[in-house]
């Protein structure tokens, strides 16, 4: 039992379950952030950071798109790598613009999401995803 716990060997099934847990957990938690912004859009649009010179409303809309809608795609694992691109950009903005690169301070959560999203971008959605069902091969 101890030998199995300490072993560095992992099989494909373990990796796929880990990817599922990572995808769903990050997706649900981030969708919650996006849902809050979506449901309070009118109050937030005049206070939101204009991070690309597009205006506060457009910046908020892009953030809601990433945090809520792309997170839903991430949860089911559909178009996972495409859905991760806006999420990664959003977290880069959060870490380096909103939190001034303070990864050990207020930007820690955004940096953690960024690390998760980059990991998923590199590895993909895994076997237990809509991508695996629709895009075999």
Task: Please give the residue ranges for each predicted region.
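Perimembrane loop-to-helix junctions flanking transmembrane segments
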Residues: 44-56
